[in-house]
């Protein structure tokens, strides 16, 4: 498994399990919102009023509505990841 997959899969899985609302920005600038229902190597199923299959190669950014904690694998540290920040958080 590549390093990219070893972060991507636990991140998406945590968002799915915890049913965290997400904003997904596509490479063409379109913003999609919903909850991650499922995912595989190539696609993400995003559920809102309808389910949408979004190809990963079209995704630029996944922004969770709140932080999620990733499970520790092979002794790695657990780090909160994601969430939105206010403009005055700097």
Curated annotation (Swiss-Prot):
> What are the boundaries of the signal sequence?
none
Keyword flag RNA-binding: yes
Q: What is the lineage of its organism?
A: Bacteria, Pseudomonadati, Pseudomonadota, Gammaproteobacteria, Chromatiales
User: Which is a Gene Ontology cellular component entry for this protein?
Assistant: cytosol
- Name of this chain's protein: RNA-binding protein Hfq
Under InterPro entries, the record lists: Hfq, LSM_dom_sf, Sm
Keyword DNA repair on entry: no
Instruction: Write out the function statement from the record.
Output: RNA chaperone that binds small regulatory RNA (sRNAs) and mRNAs to facilitate mRNA translational regulation in response to envelope stress, environmental stress and changes in metabolite concentrations. Also binds with high specificity to tRNAs.
Family, similarity comment? Belongs to the Hfq family.
> What quaternary structure, including any partners, is listed in this protein's UniProt entry?
Homohexamer.
- Which keywords describe this protein according to UniProt? RNA-binding, Stress response
């Amino acid at each position: 498994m590549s390093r990219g997959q070893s972060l991507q899969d636990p991140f998406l899985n945590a968002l799915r399990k915890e049913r965290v609302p997400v904003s997904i920005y596509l490479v063409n600038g379109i913003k999609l919102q919903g909850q991650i229902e499922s995912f595989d190597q190539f696609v993400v199923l995003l559920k809102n009023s309808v389910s949408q299959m979004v190809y990963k190669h079209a995704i630029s950014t996944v922004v969770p509505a709140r932080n999620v904690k990733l499970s520790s694998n092979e002794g790695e540290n657990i780090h909160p990841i994601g969430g939105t920040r206010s403009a005055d958080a700097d």
